[in-house]
Regions:
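Amphipathic alpha-helical polymerization modules
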Residues: 1-143
Length: 143
């Protein structure tokens, strides 16, 4: 069967952009909570990480297969909190004076944010190129 979808690459890129949007939101949340020593659940904030998965639809017909990227889940980073000696801090351990800070590195988060931004830009370029190709195909069909 002939597929009329002339922008399959754009569909894949659009789904990847949506997934990267979630990743950027989680990164922003991590940066905002980089110094949160006490959460409502108790203890310091834990860094969150977005996991992606690729979905292939119509995999038995390679010419019509649709690939999508979506968020598989958001997990807590298992690294331990940073311990900092600050005996005057309200959340300091009374015996040791150590404060548990989140396992968030702002430098790492900024690097991840740049990576996510570049992935979004690349996917936007794919959509633009697919659109241009479709427009040229339609122009050829007219002429």
């Amino acid at each position: 069967m002939l597929s009329l979808n002339i922008l399959p690459g754009a569909d894949s890129a659009a789904s990847a952009i949506q997934a990267e949007k979630v990743r950027m939101e989680v990164i922003a949340q991590n940066i905002a909570n980089a110094n949160t020593t006490k959460t409502p659940q108790g203890g310091p904030y834990q860094r969150q990480v977005v996991n992606f998965e690729t979905i292939i639809r119509n995999e038995f017909d390679a010419s019509n297969a649709v690939h999508e990227v979506r968020v598989a889940g958001i997990e807590k980073d298992g690294r331990p909190p940073r311990l900092v000696y600050q005996p005057g801090h309200p959340d300091a351990d009374p015996e040791s004076g150590m404060v548990k800070f989140p396992n968030v590195s702002v430098h790492e988060e900024m690097a991840d944010l740049i990576s996510s931004s570049r992935a979004t830009e690349a996917n936007l370029a794919i959509i633009r190129t697919a659109r241009q190709m479709a427009m040229q195909t339609l122009a050829i069909g007219k002429g």
